[in-house]
């Protein structure tokens, strides 16, 4: 009986110690994880629509990234900052011209907003898509012309 408990405890300790190793196992190679989602930074310059199509082609259920809570925002900020420091990054938020509200491309609810001060400003009445800004260390949003080219973040 004592040996069974010892072996069981040993296996339990081993399982917990390995749980942090390979934390991105459920994500394909080149992707990183947060909770149940996988993300990939794309080092191509594309318009918002081109970036969205790329994400859809890259992975089944792929979209430009939605950001639904502060923890996700901080994780993405940390990961993007490891790769880039002066480049804004497209995310999956855009202004619905029909409804005049901001919507995530994946259909999830906009539960929080993280606009930079003075944003969204719809400069020249042409800014309907959103980037994470490098000057905020990728924590804040700015509306941009959807036809501008930026690097981007995919999610599935």
UniProtKB/Swiss-Prot annotation:
It is found in: Secreted. Coiled coil: none annotated. It holds the Pfam family Lectin_C. Glycans are attached at residues 35, 109. A motif (Mannose-binding) lies at residues 119-121. GO terms for cellular component: extracellular region. Residues 1-23 form the signal peptide. GO terms for molecular function: carbohydrate binding; metal ion binding. Keywords: Calcium, Disulfide bond, Glycoprotein, Lectin, Metal-binding, Secreted, Signal. Residues 34-155 form the C-type lectin domain. InterPro entries: C-type_lectin-like (IPR001304), C-type_lectin-like/link_sf (IPR016186), C-type_lectin/snaclec_domain (IPR050111), C-type_lectin_CS (IPR018378), CTDL_fold (IPR016187). Ca(2+) binds at residues 127, 142-143. Expressed by the venom gland. The keyword Calcium applies. Transmembrane segments: none annotated. Disulfide bonds join 27-38, 55-154, 129-146. PANTHER family: MANNOSE, PHOSPHOLIPASE, LECTIN RECEPTOR RELATED. Belongs to the true venom lectin family. Mannose-binding lectin which recognizes specific carbohydrate structures and agglutinates a variety of animal cells by binding to cell-surface glycoproteins and glycolipids. May be a calcium-dependent lectin. This is C-type lectin lectoxin-Phi1. It comes from Philodryas olfersii.
């Amino acid at each position: 009986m004592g040996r069974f408990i010892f072996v069981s405890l040993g296996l339990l300790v081993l399982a917990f110690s390995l749980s942090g190793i390979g934390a991105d196992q459920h994500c394909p190679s080149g992707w990183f994880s947060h909770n149940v989602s996988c993300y990939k930074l794309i080092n191509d310059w594309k318009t918002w629509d081109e970036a969205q199509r790329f994400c859809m082609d890259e992975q089944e259920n792929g979209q430009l990234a939605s950001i639904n809570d502060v923890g996700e925002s901080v994780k993405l900020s940390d990961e993007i900052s490891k790769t880039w420091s002066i480049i804004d990054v497209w995310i999956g938020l855009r202004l619905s011209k029909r409804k005049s509200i901001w919507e995530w491309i994946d259909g999830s609810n906009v539960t929080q907003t993280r606009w930079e001060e003075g944003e969204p400003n719809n400069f020249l009445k042409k800014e309907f898509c959103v980037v994470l800004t490098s000057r905020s260390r990728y924590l804040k949003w700015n509306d941009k012309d959807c036809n501008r080219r930026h690097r981007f973040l995919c999610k599935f």
